[in-house]
Amino acid sequence: MDTEKIESLVYQLLEALGEDPNRQGLVETPKRVAQMMAEVYEGIQYTNAEIAEMYGKTFEVDTNQMVVVKDITCFSHCEHHMALMYDMSISIGYIPKGRV
């Protein structure tokens, strides 16, 4: 991710909005926004397979009982507007097929 380019573009955006990016209170804003975007969009650099491998903490089981995982924090951004669209907690249940 090109955080320097993001900083430059945020600086230009502030100018386009009629703000003075050099005024006190905004001087560090381009850098802060670039850092925030690097954190929020970090996942786009990985494939689904790579993410599954990172969290590959599964083990074999011999059961047909439902597994429930509660209160999973989930958020997502709209790719068209780059705005936070979902910020929620979810719960899932599944019947394992040999692995949990």
Give the residues covered by each predicted segment.
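Active-site loop/lid in soluble adenylation, ligation, and acyl-transfer enzymes
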Residues: 1-87
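Extended, low-hydrophobicity, polar/charged segments
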Residues: 88-100
